[in-house]
């Protein structure tokens, strides 16, 4: 559980690092769209982890940077609460969650695997954001885990 909590600390730090970059440079539509996708996907997965219906929730959006800042704060608080609760109740991370994806297909996945996916999904898209920043002549944001833990 400690490793998962650390991965989410990294996720929050990395999201905040991207946000700070976006607040200080002119970014393209693609970068912002990828970032909102990360943040809305985090909300979708948390909703699924709580056993609630996520079928009407967006996973892509054209929101602005102000909305991103709010989503980062909400997601951080909500995941901290969720992780603290499953640690407190000693919930088995191998328990399966049944959910329906955005295409309407039903799946069963362990809590552990969903949490791992959320942490890795964001890192994948932050890499895409950094690639697009480079193309635009903007220095990328170092969101490497090792940089976070130093």
For each predicted feature, which ranges?
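Short, structured helix-loop boundary elements
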Residues: 1, 31-32, 65, 69, ...
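Short, contiguous alpha-helical
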Residues: 8-61, 102-150
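Helix-adjacent hinge/juxtasegments
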Residues: 55-95
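Cysteine-centric segments in proteins
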Residues: 98-100
């Amino acid at each position: 559980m400690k490793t998962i909590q650390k991965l989410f600390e990294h996720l929050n730090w990395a999201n905040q690092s991207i946000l700070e970059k976006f607040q200080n440079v002119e970014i393209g539509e693609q970068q912002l769209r990828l970032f909102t996708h990360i943040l809305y996907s985090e909300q979708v997965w948390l909703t699924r982890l709580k056993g609630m219906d996520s079928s009407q929730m967006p996973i892509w959006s054209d929101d602005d940077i102000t909305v991103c800042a709010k989503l980062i704060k909400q997601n951080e608080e909500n995941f901290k609460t969720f992780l603290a609760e499953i640690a407190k109740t000693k919930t088995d991370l191998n328990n399966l969650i049944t959910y329906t994806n955005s295409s309407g297909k039903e799946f069963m996945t362990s809590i552990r695997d969903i949490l791992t996916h959320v942490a890795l999904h964001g890192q994948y898209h932050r890499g895409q954001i950094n690639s697009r920043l480079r193309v635009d002549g903007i220095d990328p944001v170092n969101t490497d885990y090792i940089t976070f833990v130093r």
